[in-house]
């Protein structure tokens, strides 16, 4: 065996190691050397330890770019891989919401591979989307590795357009403007898909939903901004109350215009004096602003997916809570009406209508426990309404088989648990081995939105403290561990 000369390694082996597998490479150990700075990313030069992640890259824009591009690659890789995973596990005979999918429902909502009634007839578009994302992730991954390991540490000298100084207020608002333009283009991509490229899935299309072109989007600002100015409480529902594709696509037209116009404004102008005074201008401050914005998006998405069955069709995501409840009342009404019950006059145990009743304002609504969800609007029940709530003549003569099937399916796939509850408390899920994608998406976005908000507060506090000249973090000069001997 060739003898390796390395100071002290033989002594260490003799005293501490007994296994050959442990001895074999002991002489090539690389102890932590605080005198060697790794590209300006060690604790001495940056003030941040390795676990602070991108904080070490605050002043090395090239490496920070690499970290962000690599992160984008990871996200896109997950998207592609998970889409292919869902395609591989897809069972045509089962609804999407019974298969635990969260990506194919989004693609189906965009009108790809789906037909009348929300039936998936072609999974090839989903395969293509997955593969395109995988290829994109490889490109992003290579870019991330290049900028992290090979590219210039800073961009300011080599590529001035992409370089920046966190305190350069004009450059920061220019970057903000570029982001806004890109977001506006993203909003218009949905508009283009809905108007020109195959259309989108509309759960309100006659007969139980279908893919259609949205040829006449709502552009009336009173309608679009009326959603924004609505109360978020009760039946008003803020923007979450959008209930037709014309308003939804029209909203994207307005958002696209506003984002692009705002982006151009921020690119061409410099911040006003009041803005320069009002905001903190540092990397950590921008991080806190971003986290706050993401928090709002996450919490809004959480409410949207839970309550809205237009942007998130129940054919793909499963019914909303009120929808499953009303579906149960409707299913038993259909059953008992066939058995001869007079659904208009039958009384329940409380003396109120068992199947149908009047609301305080006189509307005919479903009776029983589901009365609390009287204001539900869903595609399978709307054809049965008249000028004053449910139409008794339609209930007796016009119920279609597709409405019965859909209600029975939704009844047994409630997002929160059994609707055969006691005192309004959900007892157990009403189906076997089932968790609604609405529940998954709602709770995940709620948690993410909450913790992003906590991150916003944390980084905003640190940024404000730094701007005011306070000490960031805790003074650790007197911690006992600093006076202890090294482990080895």
UniProtKB/Swiss-Prot annotation:
> Which residues are processed away as propeptide to yield the mature protein?
1-29
**Which residues does the record give as [CaMn4O5] cluster binding sites?**
382
Q: Where are the transmembrane segments?
A: 84-108, 149-170, 193-215, 270-290, 306-327, 462-486
UniProt KW Manganese keyword: yes
What GO cellular-component annotations does this UniProt entry give? chloroplast thylakoid membrane; photosystem II
**GO molecular-function term, one example from the UniProt record:** metal ion binding
Q: Which keywords does UniProt give here?
A: Chlorophyll, Chloroplast, Chromophore, Manganese, Membrane, Metal-binding, Photosynthesis, Photosystem II, Plastid, Thylakoid, Transmembrane, Transmembrane helix
User: Which membrane topology term applies here?
Assistant: Multi-pass membrane protein
Report any Pfam family annotated for this entry.
PSII
Annotated cofactor note = Binds multiple chlorophylls and provides some of the ligands for the Ca-4Mn-5O cluster of the oxygen-evolving complex. It may also provide a ligand for a Cl- that is required for oxygen evolution. PSII binds additional chlorophylls, carotenoids and specific lipids.
Q: Subcellular localization, per the record?
A: Plastid, Chloroplast thylakoid membrane
Q: Which GO terms describe its biological process?
A: photosynthetic electron transport in photosystem II
Tell me the domain of life: Eukaryota
Fetch the HAMAP family from UniProt. Answer: PSII_PsbC_CP43
| Family classification | Belongs to the PsbB/PsbC family. PsbC subfamily.
Q: What does this protein do?
A: One of the components of the core complex of photosystem II (PSII). It binds chlorophyll and helps catalyze the primary light-induced photochemical processes of PSII. PSII is a light-driven water:plastoquinone oxidoreductase, using light energy to abstract electrons from H(2)O, generating O(2) and a proton gradient subsequently used for ATP formation.
Assembly and partners are described as:
PSII is composed of 1 copy each of membrane proteins PsbA, PsbB, PsbC, PsbD, PsbE, PsbF, PsbH, PsbI, PsbJ, PsbK, PsbL, PsbM, PsbT, PsbX, PsbY, PsbZ, Psb30/Ycf12, at least 3 peripheral proteins of the oxygen-evolving complex and a large number of cofactors. It forms dimeric complexes.
Please give the name of this protein: Photosystem II CP43 reaction center protein
- Organism of this sequence: Pyropia yezoensis (Susabi-nori)
Tell me the lineage of the source organism: Eukaryota, Rhodophyta, Bangiophyceae, Bangiales, Bangiaceae
């Amino acid at each position: 065996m060739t003898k390796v000369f390395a100071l002290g390694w033989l002594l260490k082996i003799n005293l501490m190691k007994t296994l050959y597998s442990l001895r074999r490479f002991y002489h090539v150990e690389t102890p932590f050397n605080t005198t060697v700075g790794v590209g300006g990313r060690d604790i001495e030069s940056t003030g941040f330890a390795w676990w602070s992640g991108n904080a070490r890259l605050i002043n090395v824009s090239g490496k920070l770019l690499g970290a962000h591009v690599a992160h984008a690659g990871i996200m896109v890789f997950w998207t592609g891989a998970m889409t292919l995973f869902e395609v591989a596990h897809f069972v045509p005979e089962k609804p999407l919401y019974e298969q635990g999918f969260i990506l194919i429902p989004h693609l189906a909502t965009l009108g790809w591979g789906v037909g009348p009634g929300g039936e998936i007839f072609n999974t090839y578009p989903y395969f293509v989307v997955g593969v395109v994302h995988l290829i994109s992730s490889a490109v992003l991954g290579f870019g991330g590795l290049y900028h992290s390991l090979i590219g210039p540490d800073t961009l300011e000298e080599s590529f001035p357009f992409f370089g920046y100084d966190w305190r350069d207020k004009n450059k920061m608002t220019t970057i903000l403007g570029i982001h806004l333009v890109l977001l506006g283009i993203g909003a218009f991509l949905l508009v283009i898909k809905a108007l020109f490229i195959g259309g989108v899935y509309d759960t309100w299309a006659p007969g139980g939903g279908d893919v259609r072109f949205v040829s006449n989007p709502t552009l009336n600002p009173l309608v679009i901004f009326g959603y924004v100015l609505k109360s978020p409480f009760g039946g008003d529902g803020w923007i979450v109350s959008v209930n037709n594709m014309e308003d939804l696509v029209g909203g994207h037209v307005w958002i696209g215009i506003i984002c692009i116009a705002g982006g151009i404004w921020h690119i061409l102008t410099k911040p006003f004096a009041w803005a320069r005074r009002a905001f903190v201008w540092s990397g950590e401050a921008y991080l806190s602003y971003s986290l706050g914005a993401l928090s709002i998006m996450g919490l809004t998405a959480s409410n949207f997916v839970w309550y809205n069955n237009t942007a998130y069709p129940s054919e793909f995501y499963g019914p909303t809570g009120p929808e499953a409840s009303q579906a149960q009342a409707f299913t038993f009404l259909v059953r008992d009406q066939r058995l001869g019950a007079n659904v208009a006059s039958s009384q329940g145990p409380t003396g109120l209508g068992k199947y149908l009743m009047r609301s305080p304002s006189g509307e005919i609504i479903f009776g029983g426990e589901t009365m609390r969800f009287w204001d539900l609007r869903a595609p399978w029940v709307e054809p049965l309404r008249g000028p004053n709530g449910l139409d008794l003549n339609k209930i007796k003569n016009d119920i279609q088989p597709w409405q019965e099937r859909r209600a029975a399916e939704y009844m047994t796939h409630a997002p929160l648990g059994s609707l055969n509850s006691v005192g309004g408390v959900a007892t157990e899920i009403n189906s076997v081995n089932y968790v609604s994608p609405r529940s998954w998406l709602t709770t995940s976005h709620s948690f993410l939105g909450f913790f992003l908000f906590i991150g916003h507060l944390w980084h905003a506090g640190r940024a404000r403290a730094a701007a005011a000249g306070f000490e960031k973090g805790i003074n650790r000069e007197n911690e006992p561990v600093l006076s202890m001997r090294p482990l080895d």
